Amino acid sequence: VIRDVRGFAVKFYTEEGVFDLVGNNIPIFFIQDAMKFPDVIHAAKPEPNREIPQAATAHDTFWDFVVNNTETAHMVLWVLSDRGIPRSYRMMEGFGVHTFRLVNEQGKARFVKFHWKPLLGVHSLVWEEAQQLAGKDPDYHRRDLWNAIEAGYFPEYELGVQILEEEHEFAFDFDILDPTKFWPEELIPVQKIGKLTLNRNVDNFFAETEQVAFHVANVVPGIDFTNDPLLQGRLFSYLDTQLIRLGGPNFHEIPINRSVSPVVNNQRDGFHRMTINRGVTSYSVNSLQDNDPRPSTKKEGGYVHYAEKVDGRKIRERSPSFHDHFSQATFFWNSMSDIEKQHIINAFHFEVGNVESKEIRERVVEVFNQVDNQLAIAIAAGIGVDPPMIPGGTGVKGQSPAVSQMNTKHSTLSRKVAILAENGVNEDEITQVINRLKNFGVTTEIISTSLGTIKSTTGHEFKVDKTFSTGESVMYDAIYLPGGKKSVKQLSDDEKALHFIKETYTHAKTIGASNEGVDLIADAQIYGIAIASTESTASPVNSLGVITIRNASNMTSFIQSFSQAIAKHRHWKREVGISSFF
């Protein structure tokens, strides 16, 4: 749950062999040239003299790399945005990052970028949540994915492609082969071509997950590569990685990596060989076995590379079209809502605020002043350096609504609600909420002082799922506070319960409360919102995502409003100081 770019890789077992789509949850990368891979990794990892910090980029060497390699500016904004702390693997996009080629049977090629679009929409945590979850449950994302699949809430992603004719390669103000740039969906729409459903968990995590070997060069006929310099390096590096990680050259024969269609080659021996080859030959061309094995021809379904015309000198130098490091960074910044911009600024304050070198902090402001002047001023205000003295920015005015999470899908499906209750809870209220939320695809867990059961006012027993020691507000999407005088009194006297409620509100999540449960809102010191009064009719009141109702026996209208609020994910208008810099 730490802030980072996430991998998003899929292995296709096709009739023509294995195709690995090895991507990330962000459509671009830090660097343009694969030669810089070791450098960016070394800079981001713990500093070698003290092996600190672990799993964090909030330190001097990473930001020293950023200010001296400004091609990173665009990616840094994506990582410091809410995209860097996804709510769930089920709620993040996937991207192939690079530009590939699709080649038809006639040999005609088109440029393509691959996308995975989650059907649940793209949603994120807030930074404080991510920090707490890293300590409370380091396995949060893995557990969330596993539990959702076990419960039958199968994660689904639509596979989409952006396709560009080769003759339009130079039609844009960015180089389409630059891995630090993305293709705006408003210019090149994403066409949906399929759907991925994760409908079961693995049987053995080590055998099927730890041993899986993704390799960018694993493609099938019809898919080919481009001159993206980062892609060219990855074609080698993944093979090199698997040779070491999985103990030798035969990693592709491990069951999870093995092609389901027959694949024949001249590879022999080596550690962990799993195929017993017969015959005297292991080379081509040969006459002893009638040239068997041999590569398949195109007619036989063999792989044939695209016949690309090449003209020019072969040198290690990037095209001048790669030299613009800031225009798309500005474009991304323009595309963010004020809420999202504030979150990026807050992330800068945390990350760069942990940099000890004042010179590097000053240079961060200088670099991002070239992206946007107001952004640079806002960064400077929180890291103890002077704001830029000269106007900055690139002059780019455009934006892409598709990259803002404010324009994503919303759903209640597989959302998780904590119900805070003690002995004396109102049975009818809690039962109606649990049963009807289930119809919306919402799961519920009862949180109480101790494990076991609690009794309602009528003596009905409810199983307690978590206590205030094992269940935290950051593990849920919303909370519900049912009525029942005795239950509410016990919760009101419990500091952990009140903290649970207040923290849920602080993180902009939905809160629902009925009858006496409404009193807990004020007890938790949540002010500035409207709540149902004791004299009000049995109609729900919605104030900034806090749904309250009194004098109600039929909870239908309340549950409807509550579920709609849960689907919105967060209620960002609660956040204060959003207009501080805008």
State where each predicted segment sits:
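Catalytic beta-strand/loop cores that center a nucleophilic Ser/Cys/Thr
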Residues: 523, 527-535, 573-582
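Short gly/pro/ser/thr-enriched loop/turn and capping motifs at secondary-structure boundaries
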Residues: 451-454, 518-521, 553
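Charged helix-capping and loop-helix junction motifs
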Residues: 463, 493-499
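Glycine-rich phosphate/pyrophosphate-binding loop and the adjoining helix
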Residues: 399-406, 475, 540-582
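Short glycine-rich, flexible loops that bind phosphorylated cofactors or substrates
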Residues: 487-489
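Catalytic nucleophile loop
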Residues: 357, 448, 478-484, 497-523
